[in-house]
């Protein structure tokens, strides 16, 4: 089982706290690393050798936004082939946003939910899927 950290790009500190609580209740052992902007995530990926298990990204993040971040990651040759699932994870989504996410080669688009129960279900579905999915080793 992949024990690499899960990177979460979300500037909402309340959501970060809720995720930490749900993560603990679900019993996952992967470390969580939070980033408040796309620039913070890119800096981490470019300067450190840690390869995340997956990246969960809110659509509405400061400056470049989630879609801008995904587009930037596609431009970076050093990041393009790391086989890291990039999943949009937001409180709501229009059909246009979902289409845009997949146009940018996102690996999924999930709704966080409005309650702790829904948030836990969403995290559980994402983690269960990606723990079972086979990925090339980079």
Label each region the model flagged.
Residues 68, 93-108, 114:
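Alpha4 helix (beta4-alpha4-beta5 surface) of REC/receiver domains from two-component response regulators
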Residues 4-14, 19-23, 55, 87:
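Conserved acidic segment of CheY-like receiver
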Residues 123-124, 128-138:
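CheY-like receiver
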Residues 53, 57-62, 90:
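Active-site residues of response regulator receiver
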Residues 80-93:
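A short, hydrophobic beta-strand element within the central beta-sheet of small alpha/beta folds
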Residues 37, 65-71:
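Acidic catalytic/metal-coordinating carboxylates
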Residues 114-124:
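C-terminal output helix
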Residues 20, 34-54, 120:
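Acidic, metal-coordinating helix/loop segments flanking the phosphotransfer/catalytic sites
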């Amino acid at each position: 089982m992949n024990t690499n950290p899960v990177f979460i790009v979300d500037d909402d500190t309340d959501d970060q706290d809720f995720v930490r609580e749900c993560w603990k209740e679900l019993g996952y052992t992967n470390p969580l690393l939070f980033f408040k902007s796309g620039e913070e995530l890119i800096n981490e990926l470019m300067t450190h050798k840690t390869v995340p298990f997956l990246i969960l990204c809110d659509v509405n993040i400061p400056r470049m936004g989630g879609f801008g971040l995904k587009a930037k990651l596609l431009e970076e040759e050093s990041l393009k082939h790391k086989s890291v699932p990039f999943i949009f994870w937001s409180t709501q989504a229009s059909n246009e946003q979902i289409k845009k996410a997949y146009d940018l080669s996102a690996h999924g688009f999930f709704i966080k939910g409005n309650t702790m129960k829904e948030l836990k279900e969403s995290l559980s579905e994402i983690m269960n899927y990606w723990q079972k999915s086979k990925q090339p080793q980079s």
